[in-house]
Amino acid sequence: MKLVIAEKPSVAQSLAAVIGATARKDGYLEGNGWRVSWCVGHLAGLADADSYDPKYAKWRYDDLPILPEHWQMVVGKDKKKQFDVLKKLINAPDVTEVVNACDAGREGELIFRSVYELAGCQKPMKRLWISSMEDSAIREGFANLRPGVDYDGLRDAALCRAKADWLVGINATRLFSVLYHRTLNIGRVMSPTLALIVQREAEIDTFKQVPFYTVALELPGLTVSGERMADKAAAEQLKEACQGAAATIKKVECKEKSEKPPALYDLTTLQRDANRLLGFTAQQTLDYLQSLYEKKLCTYPRTDSRYLTGDMADSLPVLVNLVANAMPFRKGIAITCDPQTVINDKKVTDHHAVIPTRNLKDADLSALPAGEKAVLELVALRLLCAVAQPHIYSETVVIATCAGRKFTAKGKTVKHPGWKALEDAYRAKMKDAEPKKEGAEKALPELTEGQILSVAAAIVNEGKSSPPQHFTEDTLLSAMETAGKEDMPEDAERKGLGTPATRAGILEKLVSAGFLERKKSRKTVQLLPSHDAVSLITVLPEQLQSPLLTAEWEYRLGEIERGQLAPEEFLDGISTMLKDLVGTYQVIKGTEYLFTPPREVVGKCPRCGGEVAELQKGFFCQNDSCRFAIWKNNKWWAAKKKQPTKAVVSALLNDGRVRVIGLYSEKTGKTYDATVVLEDDGQYANFKLEFDQRKGGSR
């Protein structure tokens, strides 16, 4: 009997169906010589600090740094039941071999190995390594199970990553929390990511716009523009000199150019496009893609490759054809397939690029949740574009002179749309599709060198230098991928912050910790640092906020994975850094009030007329002699399964009432809408409901 352990129940069921383990048992499936069970994510993890010594339960400066000599793994209390099932199955006398079928990546390896080792197992171990949940891929994977020891490097890298996160998180968080008298969560990758955002905001705040001027000349059939000028008076003078004069065509240059199709998606580039085009967060895109993977409609999500392997070349045209037939936006567009544009064995390590599967042919795409369908269409579009013909166009550059100054114009004529026909068709169906800029692809009239044209009008256009842009998830993911180095060549070996598999989770942790705020601005959602984020980066030393140093650590984890670096050497470096940090760091003078956020006033106090501001536990009058308060855990609101928000309290203070939707009735168990009225008796803030008045906006 062979035991297969998957990462989650849904995957276990898919595997079991293919290998014939169809009989349901308590916590596993069985049949055809196989037992198939599952983890529920990480069943075990590194023990807390107080497991090594009870004194570590309290945070004290004198105990730092905490550096375990012998690491302990413990099973989570809420995961013990499933661990016990797996332990019993692993150690069953009739089980001769254990197959690791957890996700084919660093974390999947650690999930399985933790269970395998805590169960005390020494039985032969094999690895199922697949990039698709299609039945054919599963059958092929089981026919070619690999020796488990081949992935010892992957396990070592995953465990070192977990230990490094533990060491930095435990020691740095305790050190700075004790020194600055408040909880400051610090992470090995979180903090340098936050530093990128804080640095960008500082650049925006200190940016000074500089005006510039250009002179444009209206000629028959085209407009030519001069170079930027810093002096407005000089621009006006040039305008006057050109007005009514003649311009001479000095040069006409026409070149045929070709724009290659884009590469296929890896996880990060898909997350970036899904954020830019669809407004999805990185985590949402990963969740949608993971679901599509488990539904056998897309290949493995957590990949860092943008290419396919040579053995996929022959079957690719069939896949491209069925994907094209399933996508409504490609109607009327001829589909071509050049497999060689996406095949590169040297650029595929663990998993190939994200592509749709052949199961798309029989799938009811209309039944998919909207988010999954949108991501699937994006993945399908990229496959069709990547194997399509190049976009070919001719570009004409005209240089003219007038009043002794040079003016230029560019024109573009599309010769063959190639892959861009698909992209244009996809964008045209989007609700928020941006209209094409006028003149962006406008052809220029036939001109000859030496030709003289009259100037119909001369205009001075004023512009201003642009500040750096606020980060969006699209641009932040790009910065994380290159550790903030904007000029890194595409083919350079990446030393980034985190991995494709972890970046989405890092962003979500920063948001949930209150360090980042998502703020919508027009069609984009910006990532803005909070007051606490700026304060934290102000006091953190370079080694904890340097993107380049953290990226170097990530690169060394890759070396461990490849067997090029001993885990002990990596962890010794982390420990040495922490010893130095604890021994040398001193509180920065003048930062006593750094972590006291400015209090936002939400309204006037109904008792004394003072200002009411939001604090952590509620909304309080800032007049020291006044006791007015609306607590966030107010029992009246809690009974209705609501919490007074800033918008609700502001309306109550300013209007005395607010319309609230979705209030819960303890009597009926249903929800209802009503107007909440504030009644203050001088001692307590009370509330009552009105059902016949609808004053105030809904909240």
Residue ranges and their predicted role:
Residues 233-265, 271:
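Metal- or metallocofactor-binding catalytic centers and their adjacent structured scaffolds
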Residues 93, 135-219, 254-258:
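C-terminal or mid-to-C-terminal helical accessory/interaction module adjacent to the motor/catalytic core
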Residues 9-16, 33-36, 40, 76-87, ...:
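Amphipathic alpha-helical transducer elements in NTP-driven molecular machines
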Residues 1-162, 166, 430, 467:
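Intrinsically disordered, low-complexity regulatory segments
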Residues 295-301:
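Secretory-pathway/luminal and periplasmic proteins that interact with or process carbohydrate-rich
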Residues 2-3, 79, 90, 118, ...:
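Basic, low-complexity terminal or inter-domain segments flanking catalytic cores
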Residues 1-3, 101-104, 181-183, 254-263, ...:
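Conserved short loop/turn motifs at secondary-structure junctions
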